[in-house]
Amino acid sequence: MKWITREKIKVDRVACPWLIKKFIDPDAEFVFLPRSTDWTKISDGIVFDVPDCELGHHGEDVSFNSIMKKYNLTDPALMLLGEIVRAADSHPAGAGLRWVASGFGALGLSDHEILEREFIVYDALYAECRRQTGS
């Protein structure tokens, strides 16, 4: 399936593709479009983490949380990771995650290269969240 979001990815737009590939759609293809895209006109894929979409920010939830809810992902370790993604500025591990995301952006890589390189960070975070939650 094709999954579509905004270009210039950071925390949530790296975490979401990681979540999608690992737990929802291992064959997912990601497309990154400009912020100015009219998201309501896209019909050839699943739109996420853009304004006014089902798999976007709602209340205190970030797109990662919305995707977890939509696909009934209830693993305690994923729930903890969702808290870290949501609170990238306030959770003890969140500030570091924001710095990592900003650092990858500063390397001048394409969004696809950032996904390829940064997925290992989310693999490690998920492993630690599993350890922390005993799941």
List each model region and its residues:
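Conserved, aromatic- and glycine-enriched, well-ordered alpha/beta core segments
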Residues: 2-6, 12-78
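Generic alpha-helix detector with strongest preference for long hydrophobic helices that associate
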Residues: 1-4, 11, 45, 99-110
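A charged, amphipathic interaction segment
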Residues: 70-135
